[in-house]
Amino acid sequence: MATFNSFRKAVGAIKDSTTVSIAKVNSEFKDLDVAIVKATNHVESAPKERHIRRIFSATSVVQPRADVAYCIHALAKRLSKTRNWVVAIKVLIVIHRTLREGDPTFREELLNYSHRGHILRISNFKDDTSPLAWDCSAWIRTYALFLEERLECYRVLKYDIEAERLPKGSGASSKNVDFNASQTYRTRMLSDEELLEQLPALQQLLYRLIGCQPEGSAYSNYLIQYALALVLKESFKIYCAINDGIINLVDMFFEMSRHDAVKALNIYKRAGQQAENLADFYEYCKGLELARNFQFPTLRQPPPSFLATMEDYIKEAPQSGSVQKKLEYQEKEEEEQEEEEAEHSVQPEEPAEADNQKENSEGDQPLIEEEEEDQEKIEEEDAKPSFLIDTDDLLGLNEINPKAAEIEDRNALALAIYPPGHEAPGPSNILSLIETGGSGWELALVTPQNNNNNNNPRPAPNTKLAGGFDNLLLDSLYEDDSARRQIQLTNAGYGHGGIDTTAAPPNPFQMQQDPFAMSNNIAPPTNVQMAMQQQQQQQMTMMHQSPYNYTHPHDYHQNHHHHQFSAGPSPSNPFGDAFLALPPPPGSAGPQQNNHHHMLL
């Protein structure tokens, strides 16, 4: 195993010397390439300070941005090509130290480059040459995630946490750090919206930092502890910034809306949980060799009673806006209402003319009496339209159109119907109807119904239907129709009694006859009669020719007599079915004869 490690070191030294030689010959940035190769060589030791300082000077603000971009490109190329965990962790250490101690231009260029090339995303990196290399590879991947989150936090905050300097006598140099108001960070002076945006980014950075906990063989490795020391130095300031932000957030918590208060409560809960995890992380790191150079702070947990108070506030918090603004609006409304009531309750008095002249001379305003002002205000309030909207008649059915009313008044067809209690224009129309034999429905249309009975003390029932139509008028029309039908049946021979020669004219509105039916009272034209005779002759010929149409002479005489009797007053329909007039078979002569006699009666 020792031979294998020695062989790997020799191969790594050869690669480094070859790379340095190539950089001196072909590279335009010879000094920078040589410094990068020597700072990230295969030797398992920390990078030398002079090589790191050379990289700092190459990425300073006085250098062109192209030189800074080339340095980042060279480091990214070195990290992507290597499969050795020593070279990988040295590249990350150089990047981390340049972020902490270098010029801000390096952070800006690295942030722009990371969006294009993803320099720190090495989730597939592994070195399985030995168990130590395997454990160190796992920690290197976690370390790269922390550096990537550090860049993301810088993008959100627009400033670097490491650039925020603690006051003298605080920070990592003190043994028991008390996070009070004396240690002011930028998060202590932010608004609630900025806090709700920046505190989650800081908490995510602290989460990645706590994840940088070495395990296995990497716990006692010198290079791992060297990089872990850089992480621990940043943990103090990150937690101080979060703690100041939480204090500022708590001060504004009871003025937030419910949506913002829920976010603030989640941040507050996560801060308490991360304080416990960070305390455990410090306890774990105290067993390392680097613990002799660090004095870990004492972290204080937030009281649980205050957490319950915040949860109770969320249940009663407003949906939007702040409570303070809402209270201010309510106070303003109450003051305005009180002023209006005072103006209406106090009766105005006529001021003296001397006082009015004195005031007007001082303010250069015309004379205006208070009574006139109050009267004008009252008139303006009365003149304001009411905002109540009647939603009962949305279609405007109850509104009266003046044009429609005028047309109804001029309508000559509506003169026959009058409401009860209204006198007709004249009796000429009624007398003419009576003289011409009008009855029933004609008189009911023009004669007003008198429902007042002097003998009956009870009030007459309301016989009015919807639209002003009289119920008695409707009943009289039905009675008249039934009487006319009875008279028609009696005249046709279906009822008892004789024929009424003084029958009233039929109601034209109740006619149920077919307008295209043939009349029995009017003789048809000559051509129709000739067609009917030809049809009757054809029927008789068919009756004689049929072998099954044998009838007795008496039956034939009766049938022939019945045919002549029925054909006399009412000729048959020439468009009807000719086979309906055929005589029945011999077996059914008796019933058919009885039916004929019944029809004659």
Swiss-Prot record:
> What compartments host this protein?
Membrane, Clathrin-coated pit; Golgi apparatus; Cytoplasmic vesicle, Clathrin-coated vesicle
Query: Per the UniProt record, which residue ranges are transmembrane?
Result: none
User: What is one term from the GO cellular component aspect held by the record?
Assistant: Golgi apparatus
Membrane keyword on record: yes
Query: What Pfam families does the entry give?
Result: ANTH
Q: Which UniProt keywords apply?
A: Coated pit, Cytoplasmic vesicle, Endocytosis, Golgi apparatus, Membrane
Q: Where is the ENTH domain?
A: 24-161
Q: Where is the composition biased (Acidic residues)?
A: 331-342, 367-382
Q: Name one GO biological process term.
A: clathrin coat assembly
Q: Where do the segments described as Disordered lie?
A: 319-390, 548-601
**Main localisation:** membrane
MF term (GO), any: 1-phosphatidylinositol binding
Name the chain's protein: Putative clathrin assembly protein At4g25940
State the species of origin: Arabidopsis thaliana
